[in-house]
Amino acid sequence: MLSARLAAVVDALPIRPDMQVLEIGCGPGAAARAVAERVPDGLVVAIDRSGKAIDQAVAGSGGLMAAGRVRFERVAIEDFVAEPGEGPFDLVFAVRVGALDGRHPSAGEQALARLCDLLTPTGRLFIDGGDPLREVRLDRGPRRFDFTDGRYAVGRSAVHGRRSRT
Protein backbone atom coordinates (compact mmCIF):
# COMPACT_ATOMS: atom_id res chain seq x y z
CA MET A 1 0.00 0.00 0.00
CA LEU A 2 1.21 3.48 -0.86
CA SER A 3 1.49 6.34 1.57
CA ALA A 4 -0.53 9.42 0.66
CA ARG A 5 2.69 11.16 -0.35
CA LEU A 6 3.83 8.38 -2.69
CA ALA A 7 0.32 8.01 -4.11
CA ALA A 8 0.37 11.72 -4.98
CA VAL A 9 3.78 11.31 -6.64
CA VAL A 10 2.66 8.31 -8.71
CA ASP A 11 -0.59 10.04 -9.68
CA ALA A 12 1.36 13.10 -10.85
CA LEU A 13 3.64 11.14 -13.19
CA PRO A 14 2.72 11.34 -16.90
CA ILE A 15 2.59 7.56 -17.32
CA ARG A 16 1.67 5.69 -20.51
CA PRO A 17 1.07 1.92 -20.62
CA ASP A 18 4.11 1.20 -22.82
CA MET A 19 6.74 3.25 -21.02
CA GLN A 20 10.12 2.22 -19.74
CA VAL A 21 10.46 3.88 -16.33
CA LEU A 22 13.45 4.21 -14.00
CA GLU A 23 12.95 4.93 -10.31
CA ILE A 24 16.00 6.20 -8.45
CA GLY A 25 16.02 5.54 -4.70
CA CYS A 26 13.17 3.05 -4.70
CA GLY A 27 13.36 2.10 -1.01
CA PRO A 28 11.08 -0.88 -0.32
CA GLY A 29 9.57 -0.67 -3.81
CA ALA A 30 6.05 0.61 -3.15
CA ALA A 31 6.12 3.33 -5.82
CA ALA A 32 7.84 1.04 -8.33
CA ARG A 33 5.09 -1.56 -7.91
CA ALA A 34 2.37 1.09 -8.28
CA VAL A 35 3.97 2.42 -11.47
CA ALA A 36 4.45 -1.13 -12.81
CA GLU A 37 0.70 -1.69 -12.45
CA ARG A 38 0.18 1.33 -14.72
CA VAL A 39 2.64 0.26 -17.41
CA PRO A 40 1.36 -3.20 -18.38
CA ASP A 41 3.18 -3.08 -21.71
CA GLY A 42 6.33 -1.47 -20.34
CA LEU A 43 8.96 -1.99 -17.69
CA VAL A 44 9.94 -0.38 -14.40
CA VAL A 45 13.55 -0.60 -13.27
CA ALA A 46 13.99 0.53 -9.68
CA ILE A 47 17.37 1.15 -8.08
CA ASP A 48 18.60 2.00 -4.61
CA ARG A 49 22.00 2.23 -2.90
CA SER A 50 20.69 0.22 0.07
CA GLY A 51 20.85 -3.55 -0.03
CA LYS A 52 18.23 -3.74 2.73
CA ALA A 53 15.83 -1.60 0.68
CA ILE A 54 16.34 -3.76 -2.39
CA ASP A 55 15.77 -6.94 -0.35
CA GLN A 56 12.46 -5.49 0.88
CA ALA A 57 11.46 -4.42 -2.63
CA VAL A 58 12.18 -7.85 -4.07
CA ALA A 59 10.33 -9.60 -1.23
CA GLY A 60 7.16 -7.64 -1.98
CA SER A 61 7.26 -7.84 -5.76
CA GLY A 62 7.29 -11.51 -6.74
CA GLY A 63 4.39 -11.47 -9.18
CA LEU A 64 5.46 -8.32 -11.01
CA MET A 65 9.04 -9.55 -11.19
CA ALA A 66 7.95 -12.96 -12.50
CA ALA A 67 5.90 -11.19 -15.18
CA GLY A 68 8.95 -9.16 -16.22
CA ARG A 69 7.29 -5.85 -15.38
CA VAL A 70 9.65 -4.68 -12.65
CA ARG A 71 13.33 -5.22 -11.85
CA PHE A 72 15.26 -4.08 -8.78
CA GLU A 73 18.98 -3.46 -8.48
CA ARG A 74 21.30 -2.28 -5.72
CA VAL A 75 23.32 0.47 -7.36
CA ALA A 76 23.83 4.22 -7.26
CA ILE A 77 22.51 6.13 -10.26
CA GLU A 78 26.03 7.29 -11.06
CA ASP A 79 27.03 3.64 -11.60
CA PHE A 80 23.82 2.26 -13.09
CA VAL A 81 23.99 0.46 -16.44
CA ALA A 82 20.78 -0.75 -18.06
CA GLU A 83 20.52 -4.45 -18.85
CA PRO A 84 20.11 -5.56 -22.47
CA GLY A 85 16.56 -4.78 -23.59
CA GLU A 86 16.16 -1.99 -21.03
CA GLY A 87 16.14 1.67 -21.90
CA PRO A 88 16.50 4.18 -23.00
CA PHE A 89 13.96 5.31 -20.41
CA ASP A 90 10.92 7.42 -21.20
CA LEU A 91 10.52 8.60 -17.62
CA VAL A 92 12.76 8.78 -14.56
CA PHE A 93 11.59 9.76 -11.11
CA ALA A 94 13.18 10.10 -7.69
CA VAL A 95 11.80 10.83 -4.23
CA ARG A 96 14.15 11.98 -1.45
CA VAL A 97 17.36 11.27 -3.36
CA GLY A 98 20.16 13.50 -2.12
CA ALA A 99 22.03 13.43 -5.42
CA LEU A 100 19.01 14.94 -7.17
CA ASP A 101 17.39 17.21 -4.60
CA GLY A 102 20.39 19.45 -3.97
CA ARG A 103 21.77 17.88 -0.79
CA HIS A 104 24.79 16.38 -2.59
CA PRO A 105 25.70 18.64 -5.56
CA SER A 106 28.79 16.71 -6.68
CA ALA A 107 26.88 13.42 -6.81
CA GLY A 108 24.07 15.34 -8.50
CA GLU A 109 26.29 16.37 -11.40
CA GLN A 110 27.38 12.76 -11.88
CA ALA A 111 23.80 11.51 -11.62
CA LEU A 112 22.42 13.98 -14.15
CA ALA A 113 25.27 13.32 -16.55
CA ARG A 114 24.42 9.61 -16.34
CA LEU A 115 20.73 10.37 -16.91
CA CYS A 116 21.57 12.14 -20.17
CA ASP A 117 22.67 8.74 -21.46
CA LEU A 118 19.77 6.80 -19.95
CA LEU A 119 16.82 8.91 -21.11
CA THR A 120 15.25 8.93 -24.55
CA PRO A 121 15.68 12.27 -26.38
CA THR A 122 12.18 13.19 -25.19
CA GLY A 123 12.52 11.46 -21.82
CA ARG A 124 11.47 13.33 -18.70
CA LEU A 125 12.93 13.50 -15.19
CA PHE A 126 10.83 14.25 -12.11
CA ILE A 127 11.98 14.72 -8.53
CA ASP A 128 10.04 15.47 -5.37
CA GLY A 129 9.90 18.96 -4.01
CA GLY A 130 7.13 20.41 -6.10
CA ASP A 131 3.42 19.87 -5.68
CA PRO A 132 4.18 16.93 -5.38
CA LEU A 133 6.84 16.79 -8.12
CA ARG A 134 8.92 19.08 -10.22
CA GLU A 135 10.33 18.32 -13.62
CA VAL A 136 14.07 18.72 -14.08
CA ARG A 137 14.88 19.90 -17.55
CA LEU A 138 17.84 18.23 -19.21
CA ASP A 139 19.01 20.91 -21.65
CA ARG A 140 21.40 20.48 -24.53
CA GLY A 141 24.41 22.74 -24.46
CA PRO A 142 27.26 23.21 -22.01
CA ARG A 143 26.87 20.97 -19.01
CA ARG A 144 25.51 22.85 -16.02
CA PHE A 145 23.85 21.98 -12.78
CA ASP A 146 23.01 24.69 -10.31
CA PHE A 147 21.70 23.79 -6.87
CA THR A 148 22.21 27.24 -5.40
CA ASP A 149 19.05 28.89 -6.64
CA GLY A 150 16.71 25.90 -6.73
CA ARG A 151 16.81 25.56 -10.50
CA TYR A 152 18.29 22.46 -12.03
CA ALA A 153 19.68 22.06 -15.50
CA VAL A 154 22.22 19.87 -17.18
CA GLY A 155 23.12 19.44 -20.80
CA ARG A 156 25.53 18.00 -23.31
CA SER A 157 27.01 19.53 -26.38
CA ALA A 158 26.82 16.13 -28.06
CA VAL A 159 24.66 13.15 -27.26
CA HIS A 160 26.28 9.75 -27.67
CA GLY A 161 25.10 6.24 -27.07
CA ARG A 162 21.40 6.85 -27.53
CA ARG A 163 19.51 4.25 -29.43
CA SER A 164 15.93 4.37 -30.51
CA ARG A 165 13.51 1.70 -29.49
CA THR A 166 12.01 -0.30 -32.33
Model-found features: residue ranges?
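Conserved SAM-binding loop
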Residues: A57-V58
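A short acidic, Gly/Pro-enriched loop at the edge of an enzyme's catalytic core
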Residues: A82-V92
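Conserved beta-strand signature within the Rossmann-like core of class I S-adenosyl-L-methionine
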Residues: T122-G129
